[in-house]
Every structure is written in C-alpha cells, then in structure tokens.
Amino acid sequence: MTTGRHTATELDPTLDDYQLASALVREAGQLALLMRMGGLEGERKTSVSDVVTAADHAAEAYVMEQLRRCRPEDGILGEEGASVSGTSGRTWVIDPVDGTYNFLHGSTYWCSAIALKHDDGTDAGQRTVDPSVVLGAIYQPELDKLWLGGQERAATLNGEPISGPSAASVAGICAATYIHPTWLADPRTAMPWHAAAVSAASLRMFGSGSCDLGRVADGELGCWFQHSCPEWDWLPGKAIVRAAGGETAVVQVNGMNWFVAGGPTAVRELSAALTSVPQFA
C-alpha cells in the first residue's frame, strides 16, 4: 500500500491474530512517524487539544485495508471513522495515533494501538461499556516499544515477558491519569477525579492512555484511571494489563464511567475512592 510517498507493507493473511496485531501497529506507527517527518498540520476536532492529522487518517486506512484482506469476516471500528460490520462475532478496534496532540507537537509519547474484541452486548445496537477483549497491541514508534498480550498469551514488551502491575497500595505508587481542564469545572467529574488523585503517592499525566496502560502492565507506572474512554483508548491496554496479571474495572459515578487499571489492590482502592463522592441527581 502506498500513501503519498510512504509505502507500508502488505501483510500475510496466514499470520495468527497476535502476529497480525503486532505487525499492524508497527506498520501504522512507522507510517505515521514518516508522515510527521515530512510535515503535518493538525485539524481541530472537539477542542484545541483534540486534533487529527493526515497521518491519523492514513494509518487507519492502512490498518483497515490490511484487515479487510487478512480477516474479511471480522468487523472493524476505528477512531477516525472506520466502521465495518463483520459476520465472525469479532471486531478489531483501531487507534491509529493515540496521543495525537503529543504526536503533532513533537513528543515521543504517542503510539498506535489495536484490540480484538468479542461482539458481546451489542444486540439492538446497544454496545456494552466494557466488552470482552481477546488481545491488545500497543506500539510506541519513537522508543520502539511494542506491548502485546491477551486471553491466550501472557503480556510481553518487545517479545520479552513483563513483571506485571505493582501489587502495592495506591498510597505507595504513582497513578497515571488524564482529564481535560474543562471537566475540572464540573463537580460531577472533578470530585471523583480529585478523590482518586489525592489517594496516590504521585500523579502522571502524559496524554496517551495506551502508552500509560502499557507502562502499568510492565510496572513502570503504578496504576491508571480516566473517565469516558472510547473503546480504542481502553481495550488495547485493558487486554495487556490483564494478560500481565493485573486487573481492570469500570465504575459509574454521577452518570460517568470511570476506567481503572493496575494491580488488584490499586484497582480496588481507586474504585472505592471514585465512588466515595456525593452522587448528583
């Protein structure tokens, strides 16, 4: 496949799902990086920090094309609009560039991510908040880090086993998180976020949920929480954290879903902190 002057690899349909996921995020990430080196401009989506570039679209188009060749019976769901209904009961969920604001401004903290999920809880068009996920792959091109894991394969970083999330209490570890500044003006989100944030030893806010979750899985970051995550921001990392021996949860507070990942103790404590605040009618 050629996108402008950038050529990406045609993948082998005989690859197993884990091999295919790894190849897709690696190729998509390298394609995006090459396009950035050639110069890009961002287009605003919902806010000044929520942007999209031609690289996002090109990387998603590449992944979609390869999946339609290699897994024609599977569904596809992408952040930038890709949507294909499948017949297999499985759907690939694509985030071609997670952390586009970072990507556009020259940071290395961005990635390409993909998950394969079961199509459970989708009757009558109703999609479950936290579907069952088969596998996830996350690739951070500028650091050449590839996390992979799923139901049938323990989590790895660049092919090597990882130690898994911290078993410590939140009070003794750092918590990675993200919240847009405007949400801090709304007590429905500000109060639970604050309750969880102050329970941690330290906070990290880097701007790429999938990069964060890969680091929770390998123990570099202690735990993670964020609200209102779409599937492409949640499922790749969820699969890898669970494949590393960690836990994940989704809790609802004031009509908002909060997504939590880490070791069992941290997930339990963060969930309790988030739900400890007053409930608004």
Roles of regions detected by a PLM:
Residues 1-97:
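N-terminal subdomain of lithium-sensitive/metallo-dependent phosphomonoesterases centered on the IMPase/IPPase/PAP
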Residues 32, 56, 67, 100, ...:
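Residue-level signal for inorganic ion chemistry
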Residues 39, 149-153, 254-255:
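A short, compositionally biased
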Residues 48, 143, 254-256:
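Short acidic/glycine-enriched loop/turn segments that link adjacent beta-strands
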Residues 56, 79, 95-98, 102, ...:
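Acidic active-site catalytic centers that drive phospho-/nucleotidyl reactions
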Residues 86-153:
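DPxDG-like acidic metal-binding loop motif
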Residues 163-281:
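An extended, acidic
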